[in-house]
């Protein structure tokens, strides 16, 4: 019997089917032999051999039928074997997939731990960077403070000989407390001139060249009471610094005398000569005078000039002038009959609160900032 019914690899599940195929192959001796010889071959090779038998005319029909049943049994056997192989392959793939899943599940905690460690490291680095930036800012602030202290120490270390002095009239010198305020006035004037030129490191040289021989101390003024106040301060050639709301035609074309006699805080009778200061040629910063211009005696055509913003810090300049007791607010200490009426124009008004003189075109007081409209309820 060529086909064993108990053989599970034959591909037949029922024994009757196996027995019937064996009977059909047994009708000719070549049938069982064809089945047993080709068990180890592939289906392509078996098909090629059966084709040769069919083409051979010497083979009888019974032999052909027996070989055909053997070929059928071999085909079923090959199909069953191929199915088993595919089933084993699928099972292997399933096992491999489950193995990969188990590996992924086992590696997931490790991956999470690594991600957490990386995030912690990034946060630590960011914190260190922030701390470094904070330390850098603190060091920069300390550096700036040290520079400021060094600059202040250098300014304090300058000798008194290079600090400028301002001469005032004997009548002002005789006022109470003027000698105690004179040292601060000299230092403020020197710092003002140094800041205006933009060269604070050259304050000593500028003070020597600008004020040597032209500005004297109050003691020298007292020793020579007959001397002129103009001669002590010298003559300054103005470089046509622009004045706020000043008429263009009223500006002198040549070097003029800059008068500060209206804003001097003089409680006693002073000379009618103007307050004149001589500055060096290097003193070229743009400064706008806060005092009104002196009108000339000749009638010139009036042309209004548009107001403009101060190009320099007027707050610091006025503060220095106030330290030197050169401020418009000091006019309130003078009697009305002793004010210089030559500096008033038709329409100028006095502030009812601070008594400062303002131009007719101003609506608010330049000194206290209150409006003229507050006078009328």
UniProtKB/Swiss-Prot annotation:
A GO molecular-function descriptor? zinc ion binding
In this chain the LRR repeats are located at 142-165
InterPro entries given for it?
Answer: TEX13A-D_N, TEX13A/C/D_Znf, Znf_RanBP2, Znf_RanBP2_sf
Do you know which Gene3D superfamilies this protein is assigned to? Zinc finger, RanBP2-type (4.10.1060.10)
What domain of life does the native source organism fall in?
A: Eukaryota
Q: Where does Zn(2+) bind?
A: 351, 354, 365, 368
Q: How does it assemble?
A: Interacts with CNOT1; the interaction may inhibit CNOT1 binding to mRNA and subsequently CNOT1-mediated mRNA degradation.
UniProt lists the family membership as follows: Belongs to the TEX13 family.
Name recorded for this polypeptide: Testis-expressed protein 13A
Query: What organism does the UniProt record list as the source?
Result: Mus musculus (Mouse)
């Amino acid at each position: 019997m060529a086909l064993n019914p108990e053989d599970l690899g034959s591909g037949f599940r029922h024994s009757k089917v196996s027995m019937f195929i064996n009977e059909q192959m047994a009708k000719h001796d070549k049938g069982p032999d064809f089945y047993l010889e080709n068990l180890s071959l592939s289906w392509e090779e078996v098909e090629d051999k059966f084709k040769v038998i069919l083409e051979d005319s010497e083979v009888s029909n019974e032999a052909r039928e027996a070989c055909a049943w053997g070929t059928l049994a071999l085909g079923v056997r090959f199909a069953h074997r191929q199915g088993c192989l595919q089933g084993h392959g699928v099972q292997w793939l399933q096992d491999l997939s489950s193995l990969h899943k188990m590996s992924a599940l086992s590696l997931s905690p490790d991956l999470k731990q690594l991600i957490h460690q990386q995030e912690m490291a990034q946060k630590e680095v960011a914190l260190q960077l922030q701390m470094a930036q904070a330390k850098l800012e603190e060091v920069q602030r300390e550096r700036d403070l040290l520079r400021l202290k060094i600059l202040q120490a250098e300014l304090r270390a300058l000798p008194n000989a290079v600090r400028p002095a301002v001469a005032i009239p004997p009548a002002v010198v005789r006022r109470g407390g003027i000698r105690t305020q004179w040292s601060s006035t000299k230092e403020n004037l020197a710092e003002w001139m140094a800041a205006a030129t933009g060269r604070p490191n050259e304050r000593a040289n500028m003070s020597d060249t600008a004020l040597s021989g032209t500005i004297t101390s109050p003691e020298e003024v007292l020793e020579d009471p007959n001397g002129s106040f103009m001669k002590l301060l010298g003559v300054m050639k103005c470089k046509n610094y622009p004045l706020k709301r000043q008429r263009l035609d009223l500006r002198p074309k040549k070097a003029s005398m800059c008068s500060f006699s209206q804003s001097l805080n003089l409680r006693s009778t002073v000379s009618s000569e103007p307050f004149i200061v001589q500055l060096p040629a290097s003193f070229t910063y743009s400064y706008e005078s806060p005092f009104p211009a002196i009108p000339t005696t000749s009638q010139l055509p009036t042309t209004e000039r548009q107001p403009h913003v101060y190009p320099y810090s007027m707050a610091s300049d006025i503060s220095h002038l106030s330290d030197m007791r050169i401020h418009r607010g000091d006019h309130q200490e003078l009697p009305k009959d002793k004010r210089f009426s030559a500096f008033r124009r038709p329409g100028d008004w006095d502030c009812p609160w601070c008594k400062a003189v303002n131009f007719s075109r101003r609506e608010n007081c330049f000194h206290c900032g209150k409006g003229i409209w507050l006078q009328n309820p």
